[in-house]
Amino acid sequence: MASSKSDPFQSIFAFKPHRKRHNFIFLHGFGSEYSSFKHVFKLFEKKRWSFFAFNFPGHGNNQSNSVDELKLKHYVELVCDFIIQKRLKKVVLVGHSMGGAIAVLVNAVLRERIKALVLVAPMNQTSFVVSKKRILDTLFTRSPKNQQDFIEHTDDKKSIVNFFVGAFKKRVNFKTLYSDMVQNAKYGNDYLEAGYNAIKDKPTLVVLGSNDIVTPTKASVEYLAKHSETIIFKIIDGVGHSPHYYAPKLFFDYIGEFLDNIKRNKDK
């Protein structure tokens, strides 16, 4: 049985080489877990890049029934506490979907400790505004290209549709968290909007999938570009909401180019 309280740091997955230039923290999405980045972790280890990852309350091996813990603001507080406790600096936050929203909100709180943001299909005010026709087309046109939109990146490859149906029927915690996310993503909600406004000139890489129907690609680019002129956008063709999972090498290469670009600009 899940406990009412949880400790997201009880099972941290970390790689800490002796010499490190950056401290990466991976922030997973709704209903996912840090293992969604497992292919990327292998590439980081080969490069000897330091990173940390953990599961938010209600996810993976960190189950919780506490309504107070299943909120976006609580997740933000947890990440901020982790950075402060570990005395981390030069932090690069890598956030997917909900984790992307958490990343921008953490940056707004601990701006001096955050070196850069890597946002993967980040939740924003264009999220959850999905065309019903596009969903149906994706469900009933079973081509490899659009099928990926509805494949969850867990090991058993469950359909994301079945995942949501099962979660909503059996698990009150996901209902609570999903409602909180939708509320935070609505137009007119100052909390998440303030986070995106706080990006300003912070080096930021946004990676999107061309077939994403959860975080609409074109609308997200237009929305995010209004908040910062320095954001670098990369769109990976043929993938949906999890470009880091379906194209890990390309995703990793984009991060490398992004960091090299930051260094060049600093050396000027």
Curated annotation (Swiss-Prot):
Broad EC category: hydrolase
EC number(s) reported in the record: 3.1.-.-
Keywords: Hydrolase, Serine esterase
InterPro entries xref list: AB_hydrolase_1, AB_hydrolase_fold, AB_hydrolase_sf, Hydrolase_4
One GO cellular component term noted in the UniProt record for this chain: membrane
Signal peptide: none
Similarity comment text for this entry: Belongs to the lipase/esterase LIP3/BchO family.
Pfam family, one: Hydrolase_4
Cell cycle in keyword set: no
Protein name as catalogued: Putative esterase/lipase 2
Catalytic residues, chain numbering: H28, H96
MF (Gene Ontology): carboxylic ester hydrolase activity
